[in-house]
Amino acid sequence: MKQITCIGIGLGNPDTLTIAAKHAIESCDLLIGASRMLSSFSHVTCSTFASCKTNEICDYILQHPEYQNIGLLFSGDTGFYSGAKSFTNQFKHREQGQEYEIKHICGISSLSYFCAKLQIPWDDVTIISLHGRETPWIST
């Protein structure tokens, strides 16, 4: 079965990349992500595809069955306001689980990193996201 690994790369700083993420990136035969993310891994010798659009990524993977071990780069953590969720849902729907196994490797989220820098616990933090939204949350 072919492998797709959604890899959380944290803040993009190689010093904060997890060892599991590093190993996954180094073992890929295809690495996919936004250009700015791929540029951080220019030393990797596998093929690359620059995109952050779920439809384009799904199409590319399905049109290139020669790749056996695919890595998708996501900023931060794959489970915290991540594009990994929409990719996983859409790809599973389109591919129907016939050839690919999808797994996730977590990264350091901006929230945990920020709280660590401020030396505050984040277990009682209220989280809202304004990313891509026009709602005036600050004024309410």
Which residues fall in each region the model found?
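Class I S-adenosyl-L-methionine
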Residues: 1-105, 109-113, 134
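Short, glycine-/small-residue-rich phosphate/pyrophosphate-handling segment
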Residues: 110-140
